[in-house]
Amino acid sequence: MSRYRGPRLRITRRLGDLPGLTRKAAKRSHPPGQHGQARRKRSEYAIRLEEKQKLRFNYGISERQLVRYVKKARAQEGSTGTNLLKLLENRLDNVCFRLGFGPTIPGSRQLVNHGHVTVNGKITDIASYQCKAGDVIAIRDNKASKQLAQANLEFPGLANVPPHLELDKTKLSAKITAKTDREWVAIEINELLVVEYYSRKV
């Protein structure tokens, strides 16, 4: 299953607020479609599936990518769910979004893919790059790159920059000072349900 490129509000009407996907809020609270307003009891599988879809759409990753992250999270020490969220939060496109360099995660991914972002002084155009404590994330030192980031910083997608990201707005640069904290994950998610969803599939 490839990355979603369709109408974003249709997704947020079904899954709720996804700050990484879009800034816009859905005007109608019920899911899209002919039977969207009908209330029916959801199965446990449907609830787990919905939580999994929230992660996929918020972080803008494919099913195959998410499966890889689940496997990697399982192989690490500690809670698989927390490890999974940290892996997604540490993606370069998400870090740029959390810093305000991009309006959304897809917008931040474009910045990265087009070579506007450097990691430790080197242009890095891989959106899935795993950022770590000590890394310095910065906007490339040219006029076009700086204008893009400065425009986005005036109206950031999220109000607060997580405390482990030390942002210098004048230099358009930030240092990752610590590991990601579960508390600062912006999306409302029950990661344990995502782990349960994949328990028999991966």
Curated annotation (Swiss-Prot):
SMART domains found in the cross-reference section: Ribosomal_S4 (SM01390), S4 (SM00363)
InterPro entries per UniProt: Ribosomal_uS4, Ribosomal_uS4_bac-type, Ribosomal_uS4_CS, Ribosomal_uS4_N, S4_RNA-bd, S4_RNA-bd_sf
Gene3D superfamilies in the cross-refs: Ribosomal Protein S4 Delta 41, Chain A, domain 1, RNA-binding S4 domain
PROSITE patterns: RIBOSOMAL_S4, S4
Entry similarity comment: Belongs to the universal ribosomal protein uS4 family.
Assembly and oligomerization: Part of the 30S ribosomal subunit. Contacts protein S5. The interaction surface between S4 and S5 is involved in control of translational fidelity.
Descriptive protein name: Small ribosomal subunit protein uS4
Source species: Prochlorococcus marinus (strain NATL1A)
Lineage: Bacteria, Bacillati, Cyanobacteriota, Cyanophyceae, Synechococcales
Gene: rpsD
